[in-house]
């Protein structure tokens, strides 16, 4: 049986050797070039392949059509991935008749995602393992072929557990690969209800919070001990790293972060003390705890965990145009929760952001982007990141006011984009799921799906094509003039402060707000064309967290990217949304203050939206880019979002006025 292998790290070396030992022919190995900035303590797959005389490649993008074609020419019967760091495209996964299989360092479905080795230690688990599973489009979600458990000892640290997992992986592969070679491949579906997902860990995640329980701090030390970057703290401005520790149950009543003693070096936590066995000051050498205390000048009673002063470091300035809107006001709240962000905003109203107006890091001007061009240009020049969120984005307006949609959504925003080009500012631009139009793909891929719209005599598409054209202009500015940009495409975000009931009264609102108005006023819920159109509804909290991570842009991974932000698991028809909303309404404590339910009413889209409207049967995102670039996964169930949105609107109604 001919195999193509994708592999890296020690696990990759173990996997390659196990495949050879099982009698497979390896046609080629794909790996990664080592990163000079990374501590490469592990074995080299490329060196092993060269020694074995196997062709080895390290492409920047293995999913590029050129490499897909080359892999297809190899005609693999089976594909294996052993700690290869990039997701493989569906085109590659489908090249092998027997399938593609990945070795994951946990007992799936627990600890999907990245760095499971470190996360199980952070969380104080007593057991983990390795799992061989079939690869599908969604990372780590395919059927399980085989797994092997590994006990985690109390004295295990990241490196010792890594060695245990490598040994377990080799044992697992030695037992299952010969069976698979004969065509007998077990397949056990994963229980999605048991799935957990963890994202990438960064060196800065090793900062110790002494207010945590001592077991939590000790587990962090274990999880990132050498050769990982280490858990660290500060004595004033001096950073130091803790490489090994033990738990002491008695903190002697000291405040968290207080040095209890220097020989041995013990520091108080929330419910005990951490004894520092070995550590390192700055870039110095590793020494025992008492010597570390001497090097740092610690004395009993000193307080740790005081990061270096940042008064000289300027905060990141974020300009949000349309700051009073649904996304704008929620994003403002998220940014102001972080000390290193300052928000400048403009909008034609301030009702949704009134809670921020006195905040020292929030600067607001009431104005219209069509008029206040000088203010906007000045603040584009002044700020670091620009989010032009102003747009007409309610379907009924596409047929009512198509020219106004074009003027605002395209022309006014193009001017802002040109300011960003002129002053070389990063722009995070809200594209839309509407750009996919009537795409027939099962899920919409940012980089591959066709953008399909209706004929010119259907003005309903003016919003979609305005946004799409601006997407293309931004992309061209990035390619030709170096504009730093990220395009994000929200898929039906919902939550408190979405539109208003007054907007719903004139038909200029999103679907759920209109449905809530029907319930509040006791009018029939109108199901446009029967309400069978399917959408994927996303909680605003999930959406904003993804958008915040785009702004943070860790490792510049979002530069030049288009990122869908939606929840594929929350797919429902408008009729199903209405039914769920009605159920929540009937259970709400304020239900008795509102009229009886007036029933459902099926209406034609033309009678509701007017001439020139077309609807879309389904709209489901692929979120692989979001997972890869943001380490993000939506987690909030649709029912929770519906209940919270409903509660917000019901409590905004003047019950006393209604009763009178």
UniProtKB/Swiss-Prot annotation:
One term of GO molecular function: UDP-4-amino-4-deoxy-L-arabinose formyltransferase activity
Documented EC number(s):
2.1.2.13, 1.1.1.305
Binding locations of (6R)-10-formyltetrahydrofolate = 114, 136-140
Reactions catalysed according to its record: UDP-alpha-D-glucuronate + NAD(+) = UDP-beta-L-threo-pentopyranos-4-ulose + CO2 + NADH; UDP-4-amino-4-deoxy-beta-L-arabinose + (6R)-10-formyltetrahydrofolate = UDP-4-deoxy-4-formamido-beta-L-arabinose + (6S)-5,6,7,8-tetrahydrofolate + H(+)
Site residues (Transition state stabilizer), renumbered to this chain: 102
Gene Ontology cellular component terms for the protein in this record: membrane
Q: Which GO terms describe its biological process?
A: lipid A biosynthetic process; lipopolysaccharide biosynthetic process; response to antibiotic
Q: Where does NAD(+) bind?
A: 347, 368-369
Q: Which residues bind UDP-alpha-D-glucuronate?
A: 393, 398, 432-433, 460, 492, 526-535, 613
Catalytic residues as annotated in Swiss-Prot or TrEMBL? 104, 434, 619
Question: What HAMAP family does the entry give?
Answer: ArnA
Its biological purpose is as follows:
Bifunctional enzyme that catalyzes the oxidative decarboxylation of UDP-glucuronic acid (UDP-GlcUA) to UDP-4-keto-arabinose (UDP-Ara4O) and the addition of a formyl group to UDP-4-amino-4-deoxy-L-arabinose (UDP-L-Ara4N) to form UDP-L-4-formamido-arabinose (UDP-L-Ara4FN). The modified arabinose is attached to lipid A and is required for resistance to polymyxin and cationic antimicrobial peptides.
Per the record, the similarity remark reads: In the N-terminal section; belongs to the Fmt family. UDP-L-Ara4N formyltransferase subfamily. In the C-terminal section; belongs to the NAD(P)-dependent epimerase/dehydratase family. UDP-glucuronic acid decarboxylase subfamily.
Q: How does it assemble?
A: Homohexamer, formed by a dimer of trimers.
Name this polypeptide is given: Bifunctional polymyxin resistance protein ArnA
Give the organism, scientific name.
Answer: Salmonella schwarzengrund (strain CVM19633)
């Amino acid at each position: 049986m001919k195999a193509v292998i994708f592999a890296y790290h020690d696990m990759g070396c173990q996997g390659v050797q196990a495949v050879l030992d099982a009698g497979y022919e390896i046609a080629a190995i794909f790996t990664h070039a080592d990163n000079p900035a990374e501590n490469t303590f592990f074995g080299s797959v490329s060196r092993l392949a060269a020694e074995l005389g196997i062709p080895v490649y390290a492409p920047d993008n293995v999913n590029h059509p050129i490499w897909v074609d080359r892999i297809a020419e190899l005609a693999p019967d089976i594909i294996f991935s052993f700690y290869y760091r990039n997701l493989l495209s569906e085109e590659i996964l489908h090249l092998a008749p027997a399938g593609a299989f990945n070795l994951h360092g946990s007992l799936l479905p627990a600890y999907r995602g990245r760095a499971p080795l470190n996360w199980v230690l952070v969380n104080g688990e007593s057991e983990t393992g390795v799992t061989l599973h079939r690869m599908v489009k969604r990372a780590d979600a395919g059927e399980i072929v085989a797994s092997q458990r590994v006990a985690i000892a109390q004295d295990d640290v990241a490196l010792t557990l890594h060695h245990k997992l490598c040994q377990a992986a080799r044992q697992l592969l030695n037992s299952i690969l010969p069976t698979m070679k004969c065509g007998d491949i077990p397949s056990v579906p994963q229980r999605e209800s048991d799935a957990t997902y963890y994202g990438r860990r960064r060196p800065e995640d090793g900062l110790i919070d002494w207010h945590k329980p001592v077991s939590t701090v000790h587990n962090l030390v274990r999880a990132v001990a050498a050769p990982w970057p280490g858990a660290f703290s500060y004595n004033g401005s001096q950073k130091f790293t803790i490489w090994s520790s033990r738990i002491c149950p008695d903190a002697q009543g000291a405040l968290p972060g207080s040095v209890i003693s220097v020989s041995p070096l013990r520091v108080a936590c929330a419910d005990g003390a951490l004894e520092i066995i070995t550590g390192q000051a700055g870039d110095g050498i590793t020494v025992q705890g008492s010597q570390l205390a001497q090097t740092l000048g610690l004395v009993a009673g000193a307080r740790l965990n005081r990061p270096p002063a940042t008064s000289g470091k300027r905060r990141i300035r974020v300009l949000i145009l349309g700051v009073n809107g649904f996304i704008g006001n929620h994003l403002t709240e998220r940014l102001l929760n972080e000390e290193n962000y300052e928000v400048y905003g403009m909008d034609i109203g301030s009702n949704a952001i009134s809670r921020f107006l006195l905040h020292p890091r929030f600067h607001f001007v009431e104005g219209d982007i069509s008029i206040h061009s000088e203010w906007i240009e000045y603040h584009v020049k002044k700020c670091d990141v620009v989010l032009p969120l102003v747009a007409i984005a309610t379907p009924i307006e596409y047929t009512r006011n198509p020219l106004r949609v074009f003027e605002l959504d395209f022309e006014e925003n193009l001017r802002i984009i040109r300011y960003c080009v002129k002053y070389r500012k990063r722009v995070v631009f809200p594209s839309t799921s509407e750009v996919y139009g009537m795409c027939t793909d099962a899920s919409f891929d940012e980089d591959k799906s066709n953008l399909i719209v209706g004929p010119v005599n259907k003005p309903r598409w003016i919003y979609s094509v305005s946004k799409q054209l601006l997407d293309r202009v931004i992309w061209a500015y990035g390619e030709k003039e170096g504009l730093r940009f990220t395009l994000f495409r929200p898929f039906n975000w919902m939550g408190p402060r979405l539109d208003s009931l007054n907007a719903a009264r004139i038909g200029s609102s999103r679907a759920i707000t209109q449905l809530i108005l029907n319930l509040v006023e006791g009018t029939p819920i109108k199901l446009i064309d029967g309400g069978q159109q399917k959408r994927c509804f996303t909680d605003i909290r999930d959406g904003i967290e993804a958008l915040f991570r785009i702004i943070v842009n860790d490792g510049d991974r979002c530069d030049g990217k288009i990122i869908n932000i939606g929840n594929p698991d929350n797919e429902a028809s408008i009729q199903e949304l209405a039914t769920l909303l009605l159920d929540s309404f009937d259970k709400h404590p304020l239900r008795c203050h509102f009229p009886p339910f007036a029933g459902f009413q099926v209406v034609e889209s033309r009678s509701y939206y007017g001439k020139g409207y077309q609807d879309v049967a389904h709209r489901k995102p692929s979120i692989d880019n979001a997972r890869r670039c943001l380490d993000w996964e939506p987690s909030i169930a649709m029912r929770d979002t519906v209940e919270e949105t409903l509660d917000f609107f019901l409590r905004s109604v003047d019950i006393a006025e209604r009763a009178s």
